[in-house]
Amino acid sequence: MIIYNVTINIDHAVHDEWMKWMRETHIPEVMRSGMFTENRMLKVLGDEDSGGVTYSIQYTCKNMDDFQRYEKEFAPAFRNEYKNKFNDRFVAFRTLLEIVG
């Protein structure tokens, strides 16, 4: 199993709007891609001095083939939508993890 982890620091000024959009729009759209079996959103603790609130959004997929298909067919449009909606109000980085135990 593969976990696609997206860590996002979102500006306090747009936090509530972002949270609503993530829960009601973005995460459901990512899941509708059919490439992931589950997801979860976690708040990063101890990061209060970052100028925003930091979250880890984790999507689980069965294998690398599903992840690579997501990256090729779906991710570019999602990232573009994200950038257009929140522009310079967030910083994100992505990590790919493999469940080994």
Protein language model annotation of sequence segments:
Residues 2-9, 56:
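Active-site-flanking beta-strand signature of metal-NTP-handling nucleotidyl enzymes
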Residues 11-13, 44, 62-64, 99:
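Short coil/turn motifs at secondary-structure junctions
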Residues 8-13, 51:
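N-terminal short leaders/motifs
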Residues 37, 52, 60-96:
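An amphipathic, aromatic/His-enriched active-site/gating alpha helix that lines ligand/cofactor pockets
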Residues 14-40, 77-81:
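Short amphipathic alpha-helical segments
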Residues 7-10, 23-29, 60-66:
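A generic short-segment signal for beta-strand/edge and adjacent turn/coil regions
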Residues 29-56, 96-97:
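Short, glycine- and small/hydrophobic-rich beta-strand elements in well-ordered beta-sheets
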